[in-house]
Amino acid sequence: RDVALKDLACVEFAGFVLMNFERDPVPFDEFIAPVRAFLDDLAIGEMRHYWWKSIPIASNWKVAQEAFFETYHVPATHPQLEKPAAEFIYRASEQKDFQFSHRHVAYDAFPHGHGRFYAGEKTPMAGNVQPQGGDPVEAMAARLQLLVDGMDAQVLQGDIDVLLTLRGKPVPSGSSLGAEYIKALYARAAAEQRPMPKPTPETLGMWGGEIFIFPNVMILPHAGNAMIYRVRPAGSDPDRCTFEIFSTRSYPAAVKPPRATLQRVTDLGDPEQVLLIPRQDLGNIPRMQKGLHSRAMRQTWLASHHEKMILNMHQAMDRYLRA
């Protein structure tokens, strides 16, 4: 009252503090409604700090986050994660029965600019598992280890430790290794009194997917963990932004979560500061920004399926700007 500051619409939700500078903003409950159930069911409000980094990127903030609104970049950007798909892309494999799983990813564009993508049909999460040689537990653990070593977020070492407890155990008739793994994760969490997402098909289907909260927050959930991106302009320079990565997780009842501390990255190319997968992702973005400044770049077309979240974001921004 003494300093006569203007009132600001501010809401605390799911661990976030969200602010709106509009004089007459859309009611928050209406704004968040399209994605609220996903966030609640994934227990995002139970996530706590694991690590947090701020990375300067030489690109516009919208370009930086658009790179994470589709999944088809994965085999080309991260060939170590999907070797058959990378072979198909880089070596022009003509294997006619090749199944490029990312074409089956489902995308949703929601009101107010929000969106999501998730596994969809004919993907491993939906039960379409390609036959592999050797021990399936070891093969699955090796795949997950690439994620742990490459980003230490979303999938954590403790998740692999749980998976490895299934070595030598037969998979019950009518079940699958993935289903048994999920049971083991939830059994461990129950014993530790650790909050977990709802074990429903809809919620489990979001593991490995993404929820976008307009205008600049992306949440990539997994088994009681979530990697969160927040992208912001860097001052008034349209060719620079600040890209933040939050590795979060829920904790057992007996464990006190660590206090959040920010690590400021000074060199994106330094593997001691940034792990392999975000280095690969974020290393692409400055080149994309340069391409947008090319004299030959007059217009771009967005794919109606794979890039619908990008289009939806820009349409929502256009509505705000026109208002």
Regions found by a protein language model. Give the residues of each.
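Flanking scaffold residues of small Cys/His-coordinated metal-binding clusters
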Residues: L5
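C-terminal catalytic domain of Rieske-type non-heme iron oxygenases
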Residues: L8-A323
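Hydrophobic, small-residue-rich alpha-helical packing segments that form membrane-like cores
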Residues: R1-D2, E12
